[in-house]
Amino acid sequence: MPLHVSLANGNRDLDYDSVQPYFMCDDEEEDVHQQPPQPPAPSEDIWKKFELLPTPRPSPGHPGLYSPPCEAVAASFSPRDHDGDSFSTADLPELPGDAVKQSFVCDPDDETFVKNIILQDCMWNGFSASAKLVSKLDPYQAVRKEGASVSPAADVEPATPPDCTCNT
């Protein structure tokens, strides 16, 4: 719809004021390409919200859950032949005493290494849901099959209760 400016009332100043934002006069010093004012730079207090928290310690019930035993680490550095070069555990750098005690579980009969492999495998490799379901249901299905073969009455349909008539 076209804009109609009414000149019938004779007051041209009021009419000019209604359309004045659409025109720019030569005497006005406005920068058409002026950018909007920039917000102030964020202070460092804002960035503290995004600060990474330290990793929590493992629970006391699982002291060696996240670190392999010493023997597993030593076995991974067992002597190997690489084009005539070989290295052994003697070539490993020595850590300070406390660092070794905190970093490794040195119990030779401890099964945490196997648990660590399973835990890391579950966390990082990821299994399909169907593989997990099958592995969980296999023991239950085996028990059901054994129970069905042991009891001969398992194939018989259970008896239905007689109809109950209430005398009221």
From Swiss-Prot:
Region of interest (Disordered), residue spans: 26-94, 146-168
Chain positions found as Phosphoserine: 59, 67
Superkingdom of the organism of origin: Eukaryota
Major site of localization recorded for this protein: nucleus
Localization in the cell: Nucleus
Cystines in this chain: none
Annotated keywords: Nucleus, Phosphoprotein
Function, in words: Seems to act as an inhibitor of cellular proliferation.
PANTHER family: MYC PROTO-ONCOGENE
Protein name: Protein B-Myc
Name of the coding gene: Mycb
